[in-house]
Amino acid sequence: MSVVMPVQAADILDVRLWRAPDHTRVVFDLSDTISYSLLELDNPQRLVIDVADARLINALTNLPLENTPISRVRSGVRYGDNLRIVFDLKAKIRPKSFPLEPNERTGHRLALDLFDEDIKDSEVPAVKRVD
């Protein structure tokens, strides 16, 4: 006999966004780790994040989108409990995503960097490391 335990959905507790010189960073504050996938779409330009078994706690309507490649952010539920977040874009970008482990100040996070397509890697200023 086996027992199937329900998997608890992860909550996206908050979404923060800010502009850097060469990219826009979006950080999703999470209640737990998530399983996600990214999809880029053309005509019109969009970036889609599908998050398995997750729910969005706060609305995405108050993000500071001025001076970013993002024109609008929207979300919806797919297949019962999967969350889809869509970034409608004004320009082509190069996305990079990575999870961030909890630390003493924050919990689980997902970082999403949207690099400006017109800036080449060689043009990105080097960051000086201070130990």
Predicted regions and their residues:
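C-terminal segment of classical bacterial N-terminal signal peptides
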Residues: 1-7
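Signal-peptide-cleaved, periplasmic/extracellular N-terminal interaction regions immediately downstream
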Residues: 7-131
